[in-house]
Amino acid sequence: MARKTPISLYRNIGISAHIDAGKTTTTERILFYTGLTHKLGEVHDGAATTDYMEQEQERGITITSAAVTSYWSGMAKQFPEHRFNIIDTPGHVDFTVEVERSMRVLDGAVMVYCAVGGVQPQSETVWRQANKYQVPRLAFVNKMDRQGANFFRVVEQMKTRLRANPVPIVIPVGAEDSFTGVVDLLKMKSIIWNEADKGTTFTYGDIPAELVETAEEWRQNMIEAAAEASEELMDKYLGGEDLAEEEIVGALRQRTLAGEIQPMLCGSAFKNKGVQRMLDAVVELLPAPTDIPPVQGVNPNTEEADSRQASDEEKFSALAFKMLNDKYVGQLTFIRVYSGVVKSGDTVLNSVKGTRERIGRLVQMTAADRTEIEEVRAGDIAAAIGLKDVTTGETLCAESAPIILERMEFPEPVIHIAVEPKTKADQEKMGIALNRLAKEDPSFRVRTDEESGQTIISGMGELHLEIIVDRMKREFGVEANIGAPQVAYRETIRKAVKAEYKHAKQSGGKGQYGHVVIEMEPMEPGGEGYEFIDEIKGGVIPREFIPSVDKGIRDTLPNGIVAGYPVVDVRIRLVFGSYHDVDSSQLAFELAASQAFKEGMRQASPALLEPIMAVEVETPEEYMGDVMGDLNRRRGVVLGMDDDGIGGKKVRAEVPLAEMFGYSTDLRSATQGRATYSMEFKKYSEAPAHIAAAVTEARKG
């Protein structure tokens, strides 16, 4: 089957934003203008196409990035038909892992900002992730019709808060109630959209007299940014020659792809204005899969670096970036194809696990509908049905050309909750449900507490776990009781020690003998967490028992001696020991190592570590004192304060997670609902003695 759309006309883009910037409405309008949805879904009434999971509709926030395919030929049908694969990314801080995952498979992104709220804390997190994956991006300032909307303030905030280089290519005509359209700085005409057909058609008009001077100024700013693309253009510009529209667009595109500038547009998705021009900018300024460098990876057989070009001629390679459970077809695995072609029914290699997978069926997703397709090619984003054992972030590739594409990094969960099924019947269903959900979401973990036998789920925040429990109920019919949220503490050591243990048993029959001497020392926080170094000389412990020593210690790490929490940041050197020809066994050395480790930890000045969160609170000035006082009471360290640009203050602090439970309710009541906050995990640091004592007491009690 030949390719329907040339790969140069593909745009794989993400729509990314802070939680209330109107991203879902923006995505919804994109789907409407690109001809997919006939009735505009409004988030206000819970009907948006991309928010296809029930809880998202209830909470009015986007949780799962749905991948949707649509087509666009330009506002004035001036382009050949382009194929957009749009990935909707969540804006809530508990779902940063989703954003990270979608950034990995995007070629370009549209950052949506609120014209009133501007650059929010979460916008900064998303920006950092886009930088990490070097994603070229445009900015779209939405909600220009709202009270307090100010496009130029957002331009300034992007410079100061994101250290971005925004280049407006349109400016607004009016603001708030009087927002009517935009001035296109390339054509130096105003664009007025037709309200009768929801903005599907438009007319060019003259620039309103009061805006001519401002438009001239911003056009010069844009041309200057374009001229910096090459010496040739700069000479032309400095020589006073006019640059043609094609030259300006080409130069802006070149600099956008290089990450040097971020073209900026504005509008009001809700009022059907501006999204259409932004879609044209996606075509003009964001990359096709062929514009970005070949995807990098490693050959699992040789461990050498390898790469794949975005071409059908190359061997097949794809990344599984999302799992979804569908009640009709079971597991859907969303894949981004980087190279080659694969057909339904083909067998491919999961290079991370070294297993073979048969691709049952392939489907193209349009928000909640799906179309069966026969094959996928380089640049495509689609969902595969029938994969048995594939987890998020794994690579699928041709067996004849194995490659592991870059591993995604997922944060460690910071909060635990115990869940108990309400009935015996729920018990089994709960196990299945939790395993499925953990497969979909690598930042969510499930384990059984050895002492209490309870099932413990861990995640990135209270909302994250609430949604997991909610999904168990809706999708799997599991009713569960949940405990109070618990903090994921860790333990470590503060000084270097030497420890020894001899495990010897002689009681008739075969005895047991294992003897180890280890040196323990603290490691840099935030690194590998555990390192084992074999320094045995002269065979005092035979080779075959060395891995058993490592295993004995690894198996002991999850339960530290302070309060039974996992031990991190410790380096172990195995320096000496002895063995018995007959009685030594792997088990004996495991037991000896485990006891030596516990012994060593007691002497090594053990400490309890607690997760510290980076917290940002935006509050009206009159509540400033209360907010600061409250953060101090919560053992917070206030790092700084800024004006938020709309008459309020933004407080940055680091606060232990243990003190943040229920914070949203307290903040609401202290500020009459006018303050907002966001937090994300920052680091682990040593808990003060009185806190450590209380935690230890509670664990023992």
Swiss-Prot record:
Species, as recorded? Neisseria gonorrhoeae (strain ATCC 700825 / FA 1090)
Protein name, entry field: Elongation factor G
Q: Which GO CC annotations does the UniProt entry carry?
A: cytoplasm
Q: Where is the tr-type G domain?
A: 8-290
Per UniProt, the keywords (alphabetical) are: Cytoplasm, Elongation factor, GTP-binding, Nucleotide-binding, Protein biosynthesis
Listed SMART domains: EFG_C, EFG_IV
Keyword Nucleotide-binding recorded? yes
Which residues of the sequence carry a binding annotation for GTP? 17-24, 88-92, 142-145
Residues annotated as signal peptide = none
The record's listing under SUPFAM superfamilies reads: EF-G C-terminal domain-like, P-loop containing nucleoside triphosphate hydrolases, Ribosomal protein S5 domain 2-like, Translation proteins
**Family statement:** Belongs to the TRAFAC class translation factor GTPase superfamily. Classic translation factor GTPase family. EF-G/EF-2 subfamily.
Which PANTHER family does the record associate with it? RIBOSOME-RELEASING FACTOR 2, MITOCHONDRIAL, TRANSLATION ELONGATION FACTOR G-RELATED
**What is this protein for, i.e. what is its function?**
Catalyzes the GTP-dependent ribosomal translocation step during translation elongation. During this step, the ribosome changes from the pre-translocational (PRE) to the post-translocational (POST) state as the newly formed A-site-bound peptidyl-tRNA and P-site-bound deacylated tRNA move to the P and E sites, respectively. Catalyzes the coordinated movement of the two tRNA molecules, the mRNA and conformational changes in the ribosome.
Q: Where in the cell is it found?
A: Cytoplasm
- Give the matching CDD domains: EF-G, EFG_III, EFG_mtEFG1_IV, EFG_mtEFG_C, EFG_mtEFG_II
User: Which Pfam families does this chain map to?
Assistant: EFG_C, EFG_III, EFG_IV, GTP_EFTU, GTP_EFTU_D2
Example of a GO biological process term: ribosome disassembly
Instruction: State the Gene Ontology terms under molecular function.
Output: GTP binding; GTPase activity; guanosine tetraphosphate binding; translation elongation factor activity
Q: Which domain of life is it from?
A: Bacteria
